[in-house]
Amino acid sequence: MIFDTHAHYDDQAFDADREELLSGLFENGVGYVLDASAAVRNMPFILELTKRYDFLYGSAGIHPCEAYQSGDNAGKPVMKKRTSGEWGFGLLVLEALNRYEEGEIITPDWRAGDREEQLIRAMLAEPKIMAVGEIGLDYHYEDTQKDVQKDWFARQISIAREFHRPIFVHSRDAAADTLDMIRAEKAQEAGGIIHCFSYSKEMAREYVDLGFYIGIGGVLTYKNAKKLKEVAAYVPMDHIVLETDCPYLAPSPFRGKRNDSSLIRYTAEVLAQIKGLSAEEVIQITEENACRVYGVCK
């Protein structure tokens, strides 16, 4: 069945029909979904979703474009006091969330971001939080704080290694720095996925040689996706996973509309044409790959 290795069902784009959509995914051939954390404010709801849906798993992490909103660089997020019965959270996450809201300094050697780190660690103690992500570097915007992003990337790689969890990496306009940090921080010891891969086939080979998987989504179906099609042809099938990044990056013919996990089939069909396989073979192989990464399949 389809394994969507990177989705954002906590996004407000799904507020109107989230329950109906998620409840119908199995009928549309979707067996597993990993809901990707992007910021502190997303983590509570992601955890709630993992408890509500058997097939849905989650991650804990801070997106590079959210890194400046953490630690000393942010106001506190709006979070009401929670009780374990109300939200169904494990006690570690409950305690971390409430301490985070109160702004409590948890350790004597506190530094900017320690509360966020404690929350990530608490999330990883939950049985269905399977990875650290989405983390990485994004230099697309002019006001990018590269040092802050690098600091958070390094911290979160360290947490992943500590917990023996895979990472999934967001990298945009930061090819060299991302690979350099992956090597310097020994991220290959954690392993994981290079999400929404957008670089050359030569760069893909560097990651595959380190043991990483290449995440491919709806962009593969676009007419102007020549470079990604070259990557897809070059990377061995046993190092490719499928993803949506929904609600973003819907495949053709749905480009510009809201994406969801059932639409992965369109990406699988294009990848199948490139690889000389059937769409069902692509779905099966990429499911097996994702199972190896996240360790969730029964």
Model-derived features: positions:
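Mid-domain alpha/beta scaffold segments of enzyme catalytic cores
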Residues: 1-298
